[in-house]
Amino acid sequence: MTRIAIVDPQPAVRAGLAMLLRTEPGLVPVGAANDVHDGIELVERLRPDVVLLEHHLLDGDGLSLCRRLKAQPPAPRVILYTAEPDGALVLLARVASADGLVDKAAEPAELFEAIRVVARGGSALPPLEPHDLDAASHLIDPEDLALLAMLVDGTPPGDVADTLRLDRRKVGRRIERLLGRLRAGTAAAA
């Protein structure tokens, strides 16, 4: 059984996802939250295997929530489940250490498969296209290029810190700064 938590600001989406997940053998919705604060509490209390997470939340940013969830052992697997899965979000999802990204317009079978893949330890992130990196390159400080390259390749932040011989807290701050710049740049381009 794969235990799933849902974090989405829309009550109908939370309820609909829970009903949909109950129709699929082996997938069990265990709880839902509508914002960052409640999402953290829910995950700490229920310890789901997978979190379905909207990146636009009422009290903050789902990407930062993803990073927080992934930093606390035992870290759940996280799938960004969003209506805006563009190339910029693929890059942001990788930087935030998300395990998957699924469009809310996808067929249920695609969502179920993504959940199963990430629950087994795999990745359900779409490929990153070269133009996604090109569009973001002007937003990135030269000292963050190595950090970004490692994150995009799927290297966990702790391993990034060890490889770059940096303090883990400093790497965390640099990742948050990088996420902020990329979010601001992609919002300005929209």
Where are the regions a protein language model picked out?
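Short hydrophobic/Thr-rich beta-strand motif most characteristic of the beta2 strand and flanking loop
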Residues: 26-34, 42
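Acidic catalytic/metal-coordinating carboxylates
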Residues: 35-38, 61-64
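Active-site residues of response regulator receiver
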Residues: 54-56, 82
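Short amphipathic alpha-helix used as the core "switch/output" element in two-component signaling
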Residues: 63-74
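A short, hydrophobic beta-strand element within the central beta-sheet of small alpha/beta folds
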Residues: 75-85
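Short, flexible helix-to-coil linker/hinge segments that flank and couple to helix-turn-helix
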Residues: 89-148
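Helix-turn-helix DNA-binding segment
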Residues: 134-176
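Basic, Lys/Arg-enriched C-terminal extension of HTH/homeodomain DNA-binding domains
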Residues: 171, 175-190
